[in-house]
Amino acid sequence: MIVLFGLAGSGKGTQAKALSEIFGWRTFSVGQVIRDTGEYTDIIDKGGLIPDDDVIKLMNKQIEIAEAEGYEIILDGYPRTEYQAKWLMDHRADDIKGAIVLDVPKEELYNRLALRARDDDKDMESIKHRFEIFEQNIYSILSLFEAKNIPVTHVDGVGTEGEVTDRLVDVVKQLDPSATEQNDDVNGGEIEKSYGE
């Protein structure tokens, strides 16, 4: 299991999808899993956080299904809070090969989000609030990973989608030497431009 972190607009959703296609893994975006329930629209629109226990239940269900089917997993943007991270460390630390953080300057993130069509990306206050929540939580989350000796790698998220994907593929192979490329043509094909959560 690999965990992929990044601010809204960092490209982690796009890159998680690319990695899942390259390695034949499953990827789960915490934002998409939550949106698919249709139960938290008001919170999402304001850039807020869903109750931790609800998120844990939703994500763990997806993880268990993928594991039962024999898939390796990329977690896109989960855990989002220290509480979620503590639960993950208590129950799944041994399954996690490493965490990757996509680093992108905020000016670039604002430009990317301005081009996205999602409703929750149109409100600047909502975007700023999402950035603040991420920054308030990420350091304590990564500290929990490091306390369990789970490698944390920062990757430059600026460049073409293919360039960033190549960097991530190299890191994934370092974190999980058993990772085998299933599809060498992903970078040359069309990857959905979701730019993550």
Give the ranges of each region predicted by the language model.
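Glycine-rich phosphate-binding loop of ATP-dependent small-molecule kinases
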Residues: 1-197
